[in-house]
């Protein structure tokens, strides 16, 4: 369950390696984020020369969770880690590459650019 103070791995080449969730967007008392939800986060670890720097506040969309998500057919999809992709305000990714698989649920939430860049959509 992704909530405030959760740390997420960054699954793109924007320069950030790890972020810490500040807020889950979508409602005043919203506590948890799942796949496809947007969070406000701060960069805790970054590569030198990247687009985003350590300490910067960014928006990110959750693309993988350990908790997983239930599909309409009753099956569950789970991943080995909690990961996100840093995005701009228009839902486009800040980086130019996506690493690792992403869930099909992102298509329902209109993150088509992330879907097209991802090496595998599960």
UniProtKB/Swiss-Prot annotation:
<dbReference type="InterPro" id="IPR019972">
    <property type="entry name" value="Ribosomal_uL14_CS"/>
</dbReference>
<protein>
    <recommendedName>
        <fullName>Large ribosomal subunit protein uL14</fullName>
    </recommendedName>
</protein>
<dbReference type="GO" id="GO:0006412">
    <property type="term" value="P:translation"/>
</dbReference>
<keyword id="KW-0699">rRNA-binding</keyword>
<dbReference type="InterPro" id="IPR036853">
    <property type="entry name" value="Ribosomal_uL14_sf"/>
</dbReference>
<keyword id="KW-0689">Ribosomal protein</keyword>
<dbReference type="GO" id="GO:0022625">
    <property type="term" value="C:cytosolic large ribosomal subunit"/>
</dbReference>
<dbReference type="InterPro" id="IPR000218">
    <property type="entry name" value="Ribosomal_uL14"/>
</dbReference>
<dbReference type="GO" id="GO:0070180">
    <property type="term" value="F:large ribosomal subunit rRNA binding"/>
</dbReference>
<comment type="similarity">
    <text>Belongs to the universal ribosomal protein uL14 family.</text>
</comment>
<comment type="subunit">
    <text>Forms a cluster with proteins L3 and L19. In the 70S ribosome, L14 and L19 interact and together make contacts with the 16S rRNA in bridges B5 and B8. Part of the 50S ribosomal subunit.</text>
</comment>
<comment type="function">
    <text>Forms part of two intersubunit bridges in the 70S ribosome. Binds to 23S rRNA.</text>
</comment>
<dbReference type="InterPro" id="IPR005745">
    <property type="entry name" value="Ribosomal_uL14_bac-type"/>
</dbReference>
<dbReference type="GO" id="GO:0003735">
    <property type="term" value="F:structural constituent of ribosome"/>
</dbReference>
<dbReference type="Pfam" id="PF00238">
    <property type="entry name" value="Ribosomal_L14"/>
</dbReference>
<keyword id="KW-0694">RNA-binding</keyword>
<keyword id="KW-0687">Ribonucleoprotein</keyword>
């Amino acid at each position: 369950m992704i909530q405030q103070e959760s740390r997420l791995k960054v699954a793109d080449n924007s320069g950030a390696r790890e972020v810490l969730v500040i807020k889950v967007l979508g409602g005043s008392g919203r506590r948890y984020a799942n796949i496809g939800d947007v969070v406000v986060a701060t960069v805790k670890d970054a590569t030198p020369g990247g687009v985003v720097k350590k300490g910067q506040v960014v928006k990110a969309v959750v693309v993988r969770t350990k908790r997983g998500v239930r599909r309409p057919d009753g099956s569950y999809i789970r991943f080995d880690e909690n990961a996100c992709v840093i995005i701009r305000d228009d839902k486009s990714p800040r980086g130019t590459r996506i690493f690792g698989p992403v869930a099909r649920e992102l298509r329902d939430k209109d993150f088509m650019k992330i879907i097209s860049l991802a090496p595998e959509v599960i």
